[in-house]
Regions:
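Short, acidic/polar
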Residues: 6-20, 74-82
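A diffuse structural propensity rather than consistent per-protein peaks
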Residues: 6, 12, 27-30, 206
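Active-site mouth loops of central-metabolism enzymes
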Residues: 1-11, 40-46
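A glycine-rich helix->loop->beta "capping" turn
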Residues: 20-26
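Beta/alpha (TIM)-barrel catalytic core signal, keyed to glycine-rich beta->alpha loops juxtaposed to Asp/Glu
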Residues: 27, 34-220, 232-246
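Conserved PLP cofactor-binding pocket of PLP-dependent enzymes
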Residues: 228
Length: 246
């Protein structure tokens, strides 16, 4: 099993990545889920980002093997703690940076911007929840909270009114945030890639439309209790996983 505290294993992972990429140097090396120690126990001390992984990153940076050190995580507040250590150049924040899920704006984005870090917005379509209009599913999903259901209704009414497809609206919303450097998209087909490119080419959203989206987002400012991390629209739902040990 992978040991995130083993310097030799970390170096081996890096060299394997270089070999697979056909490169001797990597522009950005990111620590995956640095904010969830029950998934990857990277740190000897999280508050100052101290652990073997940083020793390896500092060494690789000094050797010119990597240009930038990054964080890639999904929490809205622990990530900010790591950002404030000043040891990183780039942050990828996912699942808290989209039309309706905006917790990254409370601490992650401001902390990264203050330090001049590159900010990558991951999962702008919220793992498919914003990839299309799920009108029937929103009305029938037993796991969806009443406030979130009403929020989706308002969003879909706005989509119908302005005539902008929901994926395009989602991308152009993020394009309207000047502190975000990169929008990280997943695409399953050439058509989806073309659609993303076309949406970006239309540029940021106008201020009046952004204001209306802000009003809709404010209806549910924080994720409701027990809301599935990835909304299972169109998929079987087996309930919320049990909480693990603290």
């Amino acid at each position: 099993p992978f040991n995130p505290r083993d310097p030799a294993a970390l170096l081996e992972s890096f060299e394997t990545s270089c070999k697979l990429l056909g490169r001797d140097q990597i522009d950005i090396l990111m620590i995956h889920e640095p904010d969830r120690p029950r998934q990857f126990d990277w740190w000897e001390a999280m508050d100052d980002a101290r652990g073997p992984v940083m020793d390896v990153i500092d060494r690789l940076k000094g050797e010119g093997r990597i240009r930038f050190a990054g964080l890639g995580g999904t929490t809205a507040y622990d990530m900010a703690r790591l950002i404030r250590t000043g040891r990183f150049d780039v942050v990828l924040t996912a699942f808290n940076t989209s039309l309706l899920w905006r917790e990254a704006w409370h601490e992650v984005i401001p902390a990264a911007a203050e330090r001049g870090m590159g900010i990558v917005a991951g999962s702008p379509l919220q793992q498919g929840a914003l990839a299309r209009v799920w009108r029937e599913e929103v009305e029938t999903a037993t796991w969806l909270s009443k406030p979130r259901r009403e929020q989706f209704r308002k969003l879909y009414a706005l989509v119908d009114e302005v005539g902008i497809p929901l994926p395009e609206l989602s991308l152009r919303f993020l394009l309207s945030e000047p502190r975000i450097s990169t929008i990280l998209m997943g695409a399953r087909s050439v058509a989806e890639v073309d659609g993303n490119v076309d949406a970006i080419a239309r540029g940021p959203l106008p201020a009046d439309l952004l204001a209306r989206l802000d009003e809709i987002a404010a209806m549910v400012p924080f994720r409701p209790h027990d809301e599935p991390f990835a909304l299972p629209f169109g998929r079987a739902y087996a309930g919320t996983p049990a909480a693990g040990p603290v």
